[in-house]
């Protein structure tokens, strides 16, 4: 029987004494903290790698790679271009089927060595949306890092076509969420534009609870994303919060929003993207109060609260971890994740 590959910290991963940065509150951290707190005993039976190895791995434990990053990330490319890198792991957990397929196509990761468990949220309570009339503008929201389309959004709402549209845009955006404050420097001009615009409220980084409350009090999530996301928790929260989502068909966004979003074909040309997004958003604002849109948003919430609910996904996590632990104990040299 062949010797099991040695588990090491791969070059490009960040060494740290803690698996999860205690000051970071991005999607990866939120998801990991929840799973780890729900099943501490099961979790402790494995080595965990959250996209990048951060701590030394115990060679006496099976290792799981929970991949949140895109296959195009430079550090990820460095890892997966090494022969049989993925063989170090008993199982690779992807957060979307789009992501799983891309890793298979680009790096040859076998489907039988991975599983998809989509990200999860707790449903958002929505009592009643704010009314829209001559004294109460339609409420738009952007809640993501600034590199995911904030520049396109600002160009649109500052355009001539939007001068006569009564709207209020709330912007929650900063790399402080990921404990990467220094990354904000290159986006300060965008933040300044937000602060100077009379129809925009800039909040920077706020707690996830505050973001969810903001979703429940907003009408449209404006998201002209130009970054190929592997999953979008913000979109899930917008769906549960009853927001109409305007976004491109790019990365895993079509999978996450599951045809409920007002989406459009992605354009790599920034000017074309901006133009298309502008007119789709204008149509969304114009038609938001239509009965068919309201019915769609109700169905959207039911879908999201059913399939992205933590209660739904936690049972899948428990089943997978239990099965993998049992299989590893039976034959630690040849784990069979395809049985999960």
Language-model segments: residues:
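Carbohydrate-associated surface elements
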Residues: 98, 120
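Active-site proximal beta-strand in glycosyltransferases
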Residues: 47-76, 90-94, 115-118
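Acidic donor-binding loop of glycosyltransferase active sites
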Residues: 216-230, 243
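A charged, aromatic-enriched C-terminal amphipathic alpha-helix characteristic of glycosyltransferases
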Residues: 25-30, 268, 272, 289-329
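Conserved donor-binding/catalytic core segment of Leloir-type glycosyltransferases
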Residues: 131-149, 154-157, 170
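N-terminal pre-catalytic "stem/leader" segment of glycosyltransferase-like enzymes
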Residues: 1-58
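Nucleotide-activated donor-binding/catalytic signature segment of Leloir-type glycosyltransferases, i.e.
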Residues: 184-206
